[in-house]
UniProtKB/Swiss-Prot annotation:
<protein>
    <recommendedName>
        <fullName>CTD kinase subunit beta</fullName>
    </recommendedName>
</protein>
<dbReference type="Pfam" id="PF00134">
    <property type="entry name" value="Cyclin_N"/>
</dbReference>
<dbReference type="InterPro" id="IPR036915">
    <property type="entry name" value="Cyclin-like_sf"/>
</dbReference>
<dbReference type="GO" id="GO:0005737">
    <property type="term" value="C:cytoplasm"/>
</dbReference>
<keyword id="KW-0539">Nucleus</keyword>
<feature type="region of interest" description="Disordered">
    <location>
        <begin position="269"/>
        <end position="293"/>
    </location>
</feature>
<dbReference type="InterPro" id="IPR013763">
    <property type="entry name" value="Cyclin-like_dom"/>
</dbReference>
<dbReference type="InterPro" id="IPR043198">
    <property type="entry name" value="Cyclin/Ssn8"/>
</dbReference>
<dbReference type="GO" id="GO:0019908">
    <property type="term" value="C:nuclear cyclin-dependent protein kinase holoenzyme complex"/>
</dbReference>
<keyword id="KW-0804">Transcription</keyword>
<comment type="similarity">
    <text>Belongs to the cyclin family.</text>
</comment>
<feature type="domain" description="Cyclin N-terminal 2">
    <location>
        <begin position="158"/>
        <end position="241"/>
    </location>
</feature>
<dbReference type="GO" id="GO:0008024">
    <property type="term" value="C:cyclin/CDK positive transcription elongation factor complex"/>
</dbReference>
<keyword id="KW-0963">Cytoplasm</keyword>
<dbReference type="GO" id="GO:0006397">
    <property type="term" value="P:mRNA processing"/>
</dbReference>
<keyword id="KW-0195">Cyclin</keyword>
<comment type="subunit">
    <text>CTDK-I consists of three subunits, ctk1/lsk1, ctk2/lsc1 and ctk3 (also called alpha, beta and gamma). Interacts with ctk1/lsk1. This interaction is dependent on ctk1/lsk1 kinase activity.</text>
</comment>
């Protein structure tokens, strides 16, 4: 190994999805009040996106990035609004809808301080923007590292439109399903299941809301009933606890949504499928604990670095990592 070559201390592979057990393990150690703060962050992203005229796919991806960020970093460790804005910055670049960074910072300041009259070209405005610039840039870097610079994204809306056309749904039903897809970004379901499963679940919920018979889902949709029902459960849970923060919640009464949830739970019990919650070992470390420990080791080692890889390169770099760790232990005389 060359003397000036940085040692790869950590190899991080992109994980587009996490299991129900992995997410539950992280959330079991968190304050339930964090969910309310997460909804505040989503409201901030939605309002800022409307101000900057971002499309739904950009604001939705920003919410998805924020949910991932909050899994690995508790709310009390990060500035809420600045983190939400940083996620929106990353999402705008991934979706190729980027705005000038200065315009985003200015919109961030004006939204944080409503009613303030600041000239966008004044020296005062420049100083106010610079105060948040470094902080948001730092959070942007953390977000990029958290997703391992993996910019592959699939949105449920695209699948939903294709499925709705295939099933010959009316425009009103498709419109409701579209809003359900948008609400799905405010849950963890987008981190657990592929976008096409979320699309099928959204169509099912839209049919229930309009009291239409459930469509027969073709096998070509590749949407197993068990996965679809798991997504439906997550979205209905959002409507039960955070109705005012959702698109559908503003279209239907609480009684309507509550009845929908009760009917779904009753159908789940009668289906005969086991409804066992994931078994969580309280003594095992979570993904968030391991990630923070890895960051700590990198900060303590001045000459080490992390390597970010996609799934196709995992085998090669895992072998390389094992060789380097063995070499390090030999140099220290521990082998």
């Amino acid at each position: 190994m060359a003397e000036n070559e940085n040692h790869v201390l950590s190899i991080r592979m992109s994980h587009p999805y996490y299991s129900e057990k992995e997410i539950s393990r992280i959330l079991s150690t968190r304050d339930p009040k964090e969910n309310n703060l997460r909804m505040q962050a989503f409201a901030w992203i939605s309002t800022l996106s409307k101000t900057l005229k971002f499309p739904v796919r950009t604001s939705g991806l920003a919410m998805l990035l924020y949910s991932r960020f909050q899994l690995f970093f508790p709310v009390n460790e990060i500035p809420l609004l600045e983190c939400a804005t940083a996620c929106l910055v990353v999402a705008s670049k991934i979706e190729d809808t980027a705005k000038k960074f200065r315009d985003i910072l200015l919109a961030h300041y004006l939204q944080k301080h409503p009613g303030s009259e600041v000239d966008a070209h004044s020296q005062v405005c420049y100083k106010l923007i610079e105060e948040n610039k470094k902080r948001i840039l730092g959070l942007e870097r953390m977000t990029l590292e958290l997703i391992c610079f993996d910019f592959r994204v699939r949105h449920p809306h695209n699948y939903m439109v294709k499925f709705a056309k295939s099933l010959k749904f009316s425009s009103s039903t498709a419109s409701i399903a579209w809003n359900v897809c948008t609400d799905a970004y405010k849950t963890y379901t987008m981190l657990k299941y592929p976008a096409h499963i979320v699309a099928v679940a959204s169509i099912s919920i839209a049919c229930k809301l309009q009291q239409l018979p459930q469509p027969i889902i073709p096998r070509s949709f590749f949407a197993p009933p068990a996965l679809t029902e798991a997504v439906i459960a997550d979205i209905l849970d959002l409507y039960m606890h955070y109705q005012p923060h959702t698109c559908i919640g503003n279209m239907y009464t609480t009684e309507k949504l509550l009845g929908l949830c009760v009917d779904f739970q009753r159908a789940q019990k009668n289906s005969g499928r086991p409804q066992k919650p994931p078994q969580i070992d309280p003594h095992s470390s979570s993904l968030a604990d391991e990630y923070r420990e890895s960051n700590k080791r990198l900060q303590e080692s001045k000459e080490s670095c992390a390597r970010f890889i996609l799934d196709c390169d995992r085998k090669y770099f895992n072998t390389e990592f094992e060789k380097r760790m063995l070499e390090e232990r030999r140099n220290k005389g521990t082998v």
